[in-house]
UniProtKB/Swiss-Prot annotation:
The gene is fusA. NCBIfam families: EF-G (TIGR00484), PRK12740.1-5 (NF009381), small_GTP (TIGR00231). GO terms for cellular component: cytoplasm. GO terms for biological process: ribosome disassembly. Catalyzes the GTP-dependent ribosomal translocation step during translation elongation. During this step, the ribosome changes from the pre-translocational (PRE) to the post-translocational (POST) state as the newly formed A-site-bound peptidyl-tRNA and P-site-bound deacylated tRNA move to the P and E sites, respectively. Catalyzes the coordinated movement of the two tRNA molecules, the mRNA and conformational changes in the ribosome. This is Elongation factor G. InterPro entries: EF-G-like_DII (IPR053905), EFG_II (IPR041095), EFG_III (IPR009022), EFG_III/V (IPR035647), EFG_IV (IPR047872), EFG_V (IPR035649), EFG_V-like (IPR000640), G_TR_CS (IPR031157). It is found in: Cytoplasm. Belongs to the TRAFAC class translation factor GTPase superfamily. Classic translation factor GTPase family. EF-G/EF-2 subfamily. The keyword rRNA processing does not apply. Residues 8-283 form the tr-type G domain. SMART domains: EFG_C (SM00838), EFG_IV (SM00889). The keyword Cytoplasm applies.
Amino acid sequence: MSKMNKLEHIRNIGICAHIDAGKTTTTERILYYTGKSHKIGEVHDGGATMDWMEQEQERGITITSAATTCRWQDKIINIIDTPGHVDFTIEVERSLRVLDGAVAVFDGVAGVEPQSETVWRQADKYNVPRMCFVNKMDRMGADFYRCVEMIKDRLGAKPLVLQLPVGIEENFKGIIDLVKMKAVIWKDESLGAEYCEEDIPADMKDKAEEYRAKLLDMVVELDDTIMEKYLSGEEVTEEEIKRLIRKGTISAAFYPVLCGSAFKNKGVQPLLDAVVYFLPSPIDIGIVKGIEVSTGEEKDFPVSVIEPFAALAFKIMNDPFVGSLTFIRIYSGKIASGITVINTVKNKKEKIGRMLLMHANNREDVKEASAGDIVALAGLKDTTTGDTLSDVDKQVILERMEFPEPVIELAVEPKSTADQEKMGLALSRLAAEDPSFRVSMDHETGQTVIKGMGELHLEIIIDRMRREFKVEANIGAPQVAYRETITKACEIDYTHKKQSGGAGQFARVKIIFEPLKEVKDLEDEDKNKTFVFASKIVGGAVPKEYIPGVEKGLNNIRETGVIAGYPMIDFKATLVDGAFHDVDSSVLAFEIAAKAAFREGMPKGDPKLLEPIMKVEVITPDEYMGDIIGDLNSRRGQIQSMDPRGNAQVVTANVPLAEMFGYVNTLRSLSQGRAQFSMIFSHYDQVPSQVADIIKAKK
């Protein structure tokens, strides 16, 4: 197979879903039918191939996106298994950045759940073409048609139904293929490996005709010639329909919807066929955006084997046998063991040692890899998630990934002196793997503080510290990651002078601080930042070489705000004037001046305390609804919506994270264990003054 031809044969896909929608089971079945896995792993018994960290096998949830390579027909499918729990959305975000297409798995009973919405929005952000697989069609209460409506209403997406279920709940036995207009029925005794095509059952003929007409109406819109043919009553061929479905899927004109039951081994092979037929190859994506290092200009780089090498590191993992593994997606060029490449973000060279193709936790050594491939590199020294590896002579930086701020933190203390050093190493390794996990030192108490996206996230980090690094630690109670901000603009003119014999220090800075939301001319790249620095110095009032000192000083000091010592966010600092001394000025002097200007100036900006607000969704039987809403209101919650779902009610509310600790036990007792909830970070908002006073008093 020629190299360019090989690109057409690759599918880099992710399988994304809400926790428990059956995503890992679906991936397992794909590996089974593509011949990479000889025994079907079940999440229920902790034996799934993709869930390979011990914690995942115990909890039955997928934490790490393991990359797996398999083949179907003549295509290579690289699957990134993404976690479905809200605390791990960072993993999903990372994998979506390097995918060409995705399969969104929905629970046929629950439909579109909160995490499904979150993942869908993340996929929108990266323009990932995707198709939908409505799973669990064999379960009590499964409703394919309701799920399709929810995809339309909740996600605002345009579903293109390609299959209908044959039989419902425990009688589910197959699908109707609306492209071929045939029924596909599975034989239970063959573990789903054997199925046969039959005529459409008589009682489903009308429904199949109705949905076939809807399908044709949607796809022919993409091609004027075929539309004329269709409108004049001519038959549209199967090949033409498939070509148009592919075109519409890649352009996100619509999202194909398939159905099945992965657990009962039904519907997996047609899903694989659809991945191959309809999801894009790296060539269909065509270009990747990046910055040419030599000119600093943003450019579009073609995805091609003959272009210079460029790859994005999207995951770092510690492997017990190989050590640190860096997963990369190669966008252009090729790479071989023994060559040297450059990390253009850190400006450090890296020598390529072992290269591995991963199959969950089995590995296969390869000597070279090229555009379109996803491989793991062993032994890289300086590369972390989001970095670009590039050809040394033709350097590029691919667009960086953005990572959310952690919302929860807790103190950890090693149990013994022996654990002290090991803990430092363990935490720095875990932070290199996971950019949404941060480690810092509390300057007042001297404690190590770890920060993450939720209680489960930090629980698993501590668990991994114990299991993988053999570190025993005492854990403090979880704390909310409060922030501070200013609500009005203010200006400060500060002069730092130090004369005590020998070389002195001198720096004068005039800085305007303003809330980000009031800044009119914010650059696009600054819109997602929490702090923006700009210099409007003219005429050399502050020499160029000293300006980075001002930015560094502000960046350091903003970590301890002026109200209660929490990090200061959502503000812009503009250096507008200043003065220097030929002998006594230095970068350090300007750094000190900037810090003092912050301390003196920020209190004039009417600073306020901010707290993380969570989007909480509670699913409850009708009879507990009143009590649950009353309880959410008592937690300073704001009810956003109440919707019926089957015979239950879904309550969505925005609630401060500080009020949600221990909610799982309250909900259990309010509903006799029948209600469930999920929550995800929504935004930061001002803390009411009476609550802010209590928080300040505790600091």
